[in-house]
UniProtKB/Swiss-Prot annotation:
It is found in: Nucleus; Mitochondrion. This is Putative pre-mRNA-splicing factor ATP-dependent RNA helicase DHX32. ATP binds at residues 85-92. Belongs to the DEAD box helicase family. DEAH subfamily. The keyword Transcription does not apply. It comes from the Eukaryota. Its EC number is 3.6.4.13. InterPro entries: DEAD-box_helicase_OB_fold, HA2_WH, Helicase-assoc_dom, Helicase_ATP-bd, P-loop_NTPase.
Length: 743
C-alpha cells in the first residue's frame, strides 16, 4: 500500500487560506476578527467554505441522514454494525464520514478509516465526492488507493480502496493496525476479495477488540449476514419510491427488436428523462448502439438522442448528471445509456426516468477440470433486478421495463447473485491464503465455501508452478510470486525472465495483458482501415511480441510529442485505446518498482535479437506451459493439450490477419463460448516446450496424439535419459497429491 502511483487529481500540497484576510492593508484587524467567528473544520483547522454548507444541505436530504444518531450510538457500543440500504440512500459517502468523525473524537488512537469498494471507478469518484463534502483536499485528509495508483499520505484520515488492495495490505500488515474502522461496502457484489475479507476479519476482530467493522449491503443479503456474524445491530435505511414495473405478457425469443422499439417509443412520447438499457453482453451494446445512432435524428423536433455506451470491464467514465453548461443547452438531449451486468455502479445520475432490463447476462464460469472459463447465458438474480430498479432513485414517475415475464422473474431468477468464489479461478486467492498463513492467519471462515474441486485445481497449479514446497507451504518462488499483483502464471513468467535476461520485455507483456484491451472499438465501416493500421505493429513471432511493438511505438510517440493531444491523436489514427496504453505504462512502472524493491536481476533491453526472442518464449513457457495448443488439421483448429476442446485463433490475432497458422502455440486466454477463441498467442516449438515443462505435469497429461508427438520429441532429444525421467515422474506424482491440501 506504500507504493507510489499516479498523481492525485486536484491534489495540492498547499492548504487553503481565507481570502485576503492576512493582507497587511488597513482594516485587517476587523477581517481577522470576523474570521474568528467562522466555524472551523476539525479535520484541517480551517474555516468551512460556503460550498461546504451547500453540500451539507444536500447531504441532510439523503435517506441515510435520519439514521446518523442511531448509527453513531451503535458504533460506540458494538464492534460490528451492518447498514442495510438501497443503491441511492447515501450510505457509501456518509457512513465513512461519520466513522471519520468517530475516529477524530477518540484522537485516532486506534487509527483512521478505510472503506472498500469492488470497482475502481467508484473508489475514485467517492473519494473526490467525500473530500468535497468534508471540505478538505483530496490526497491529504481523504484519499484513495486502487491497483497501481496511490493517492494517500501518512496523514490521510479516510481512505477509499478496492477490496483487493486491502486484501494485499494484509500480506504485510495482517491485523490492519493502521485502521480503527474498516468499512466493507457493496458486499452484495460477492467478489472474491470481499468474501475473503469477511472471513479473515473475523479473526482480526478477535485479536483487536478496539477495531470496528461496518458492513454496507443491499437488503437482500441481510438475513445471510445475520446468520454469518450472529446477533449484530442492523441499521435499516428506508428509501422507497413508487416505480411502475412493466413485464412482458409472454416470453420473446429475441429481445433486440423490443429494446429498439421501446427506446424510440419512449423518445416519441415526449416524456423527459434519460434511458438506461441493461444488455446481456458487450457485443449487444455495439449492436444496439449502431442501430440507435442511425435512428437518433429521425424526429429532430423531439430533441437529440445521445447514445452513451458504458463498458463496466473497461476503464470508462461514470454516467453522471449534466453540468450547468450542458443544462443551459437550447436543444433538449435525451441520453440512452447502454451497459451490461455490473453497470449499475456506473450510473450516478438522477436524470434517469426509464430502465429497460433484458433479464439475462453472459457470465464467466470457471471449469477447473479443463482450466478454462465458459461463457454462459444465465438469468440475472432477483437482487440484481431490484438494484437496477433502484437506479430510478427519487423519480416519482420512473418506469422499469422488464423484457421478461413475471413468472420468469419469480421462477427462473435466483434470489441472490452467485458468489464469485464459486464460479472463478481460485489460484490467486489460494496463493494469497498461503501467504497469509506465513503471517499467522491461515483460517478463513468463508460465507460460501468454494468447491473442493476448484481448491484442488488451484493447489495443483501452484504446485506445478513451483510455488509450493514439499509440505504444501509457499516456497521461496511462491513468496516472491505473491509480491506481484498479477495472476500466478504471469508472476512466474516474470521470475523466469530474470533467469533468461529478458525482464524488460516480459514486464511490457505483463503490463499490456493486465491493462484493458489496447485495441479500440472500431466503428462500423472502419474495419479494413483499422486492420491496415494494426498490421504495422505485427510481429512474426506472435501476439506477445506484437504487444511489445505497440507499447514501444506508444512510448516513442509520447517521447517525441509536444502535447498529450498529439499522443491521443496518434492513438485515434491507429485505432488504439489511449487510456489503456497509459494504464499499461503505469502498471509497467509499478512492476519495475517491485523488481527493484525485492532486488531481482534486471537485464538491459535487447528486443529484436534472436537470442532475446528465444528467451522471451522460455520465460512465457515457464508460466504458461499449461496453456499450449496444437493445430490438428492445418486449418487453424487448435486442440488443447490438457483436454479435448478445440478452439480457433481470435480474429485480432496476428496469425489470423496474416493467415499463417503455426502448428504449436502458447496462449494467454481461452474461453468456451460460441467461437471458442484462444487469445494472445505466440508460436512455440515442441522441443522448447519439453525442455521447460515440469516432468510430473507432462506425465499427468491425458493420452492424446499431441502427447505422443511430444514423447517422440523427448525420445529424440535424450533417448538415454528417458528411463530416469519416467522414474522421476513416478516419484514426483505421489508427492504432488500429498502437497495439494489447504493447510
Amino acid at each position: 500500500m506504500e507504493e507510489e502511483g499516479l498523481e492525485c487529481p486536484n491534489s495540492s500540497s498547499e492548504k487553503r487560506y481565507f481570502p485576503e484576510s492576512l493582507d497587511s492593508s488597513d482594516g485587517d484587524e476587523e477581517e481577522v476578527l470576523a474570521c474568528e467567528d467562522l466555524e472551523l473544520n476539525p479535520f484541517d483547522g480551517l474555516p468551512y467554505s460556503s460550498r461546504y454548507y451547500k453540500l451539507l444541505k444536500e447531504r441532510e436530504d439523503l435517506p441515510i441522514w435520519k439514521e446518523k444518531y442511531s448509527f453513531m450510538e451503535n458504533l460506540l457500543q458494538n464492534q460490528i454494525v451492518i447498514v442495510s440500504g438501497d443503491a441511492k440512500c447515501g450510505k457509501s459517502a456518509q457512513v465513512p464520514q461519520w466513522c471519520a468523525e468517530y475516529c477524530l473524537s477518540i484522537h485516532y488512537q486506534h487509527g483512521g478509516v478505510i472503506c472498500t469498494q469492488v470497482h475502481k471507478q467508484t473508489v475514485v469518484q467517492l473519494a473526490l465526492r467525500v473530500a468535497d463534502e468534508m471540505d478538505v483536499n483530496i490526497g491529504h485528509e481523504v484519499g484513495y488507493v486502487i491497483p497501481f495508483e496511490n493517492c494517500c499520505t501518512n496523514e490521510t484520515i479516510l481512505r477509499y480502496c478496492t477490496d483487493d488492495m486491502l486484501q494485499r495490505e494484509m500480506m504485510s500488515n495482517p491485523f490492519l493496525g493502521s485502521y480503527g474502522v474498516i468499512i466493507l461496502d457493496d458486499i452484495h457484489e460477492r467478489s472474491i476479495a470481499t468474501d475473503v475479507l469477511l472471513g479473515l476479519l473475523k479473526d482480526v476482530l478477535l485479536a483487536r477488540p478496539e477495531l470496528k467493522l461496518i458492513i454496507n449491503s443491499s437488503p437482500h443479503l441481510i438475513s445471510k449476514l445475520n446468520s454469518y456474524y450472529g446477533n449484530v445491530p442492523v441499521i435499516e435505511v428506508k428509501n422507497k419510491h413508487p416505480v411502475e414495473v412493466v413485464y412482458l405478457s409472454e416470453a420473446q425469443k429475441d429481445s433486440f427488436e423490443s429494446i429498439l422499439r421501446l427506446i424510440f417509443e419512449i423518445h416519441h412520447s415526449g416524456e423527459k428523462g434519460d434511458i438506461v438499457v441493461f444488455l446481456a453482453c458487450e457485443q449487444d451494446i455495439e449492436k444496439v448502439c449502431e442501430t440507435v445512432y442511425q435512428g437518433s435524428n429521425l424526429n429532430p423536433d423531439l430533441g437529440e438522442l445521445v447514445v452513451v455506451p458504458l463498458y463496466p470491464k473497461e476503464k470508462c467514465s461514470l454516467f453522471k448528471p449534466l453540468d450547468e453548461t450542458e443544462k443551459r443547452c437550447q436543444v433538449y438531449q435525451r441520453r440512452v445509456v447502454l451497459t451490461t451486468s455490473s453497470g449499475e455502479f456506473l450510473i450516478w445520475s438522477n436524470s434517469v426516468r426509464f430502465v429497460i432490463d433484458v433479464g439475462v447476462e453472459r457470465r464467466k464460469v470457471y471449469n477447473p477440470r479443463i482450466r478454462a472459463n465458459s461463457l454462459v447465458m444465465q438469468p440475472i438474480s432477483q437482487s440484481q433486478a431490484e438494484i437496477r430498479k433502484q437506479i430510478l432513485g427519487s423519480s416519482s414517475s420512473g418506469k422499469f421495463f422488464c423484457l421478461y415475464t413475471e413468472e420468469f422473474a419469480s421462477k427462473d431468477m435466483t434470489p441472490l447473485k452467485p458468489a464469485e468464489m464459486q464460479e472463478a479461478n481460485l489460484t490467486s486467492m489460494v496463493l494469497f491464503m498461503k501467504r497469509i498463513d506465513i503471517a499467522g492467519l491461515g483460517h478463513c471462515d468463508f460465507m460460501n465455501r468454494p468447491a473442493p474441486e476448484s481448491l484442488m485445481q488451484a493447489l495443483e497449479d501452484l504446485d506445478y508452478l513451483a510455488a509450493l514446497d514439499n509440505d504444501g507451504n509457499l516456497s521461496e518462488f511462491g513468496i516472491i510470486m505473491s509480491e506481484f499483483p498479477l495472476d500466478p502464471q504471469l508472476s512466474k513468467s516474470i521470475l523466469a525472465s530474470c533467469e533468461f535476461d529478458c525482464v524488460d520485455e516480459v514486464l511490457t507483456i505483463a503490463a499490456m495483458v493486465t491493462a484493458p484491451n489496447c485495441f479500440s472499438h472500431v466503428p462500423h465501416g472502419a474495419e479494413e482501415a483499422a486492420l491496415t493500421c494494426w498490421k504495422t505493429f505485427l510481429h512474426p513471432e506472435g501476439d506477445h511480441f506484437t504487444l511489445i511493438s505497440i507499447y514501444k511505438a506508444y512510448q516513442d510517440t509520447t517521447l517525441n510529442s509536444s502535447s498529450e493531444y498529439c499522443v491521443e491523436k496518434w492513438c485515434r489514427d491507429y485505432f488504439l485505446n489511449c487510456s489503456a496504453l497509459r494504464m499499461a505504462d503505469v502498471i509497467r512502472a509499478e512492476l519495475l518498482e517491485i523488481i527493484k524493491r525485492i532486488e531481482l536481476p534486471y537485464a538491459e533491453p535487447a528486443f529484436g535479437s534472436k537470442e532475446n526472442t528465444l528467451n522471451i518464449k522460455k520465460a512465457l513457457l515457464s508460466g504458461y506451459f499449461m496453456q499450449i495448443a496444437r493445430d490438428v488439421d492445418g486449418s487453424g483448429n487448435y486442440l488443447m493439450l490438457t483436454h479435448k476442446q478445440v478452439a480457433q485463433l481470435h480474429p485480432l490475432s496476428g496469425y489470423s490477419i496474416t493467415k499463417k497458422m503455426p502448428e504449436w502455440v502458447l496462449f494467454h486466454k481461452f474461453s468456451i463460448s460460441e467461437n471458442n477463441y484462444i487469445r494472445i498467442t505466440s508460436e512455440i516449438s515442441p522441443e522448447l516446450f519439453m525442455q521447460l515443462v515440469p516432468q510430473y505435469y507432462f506425465s499427468n497429461l491425458p493420452p492424446s496424439e499431441s502427447k505422443d508427438i511430444l514423447q517422440q520429441v523427448v525420445d529424440h532429444l535424450s533417448p538415454v535419459s528417458t528411463m530416469n525421467k519416467e522414474q522421476q515422474m513416478c516419484e514426483t506424482c505421489p508427492e504432488t497429491e500429498q502437497r495439494c491440501t489447504l493447510q
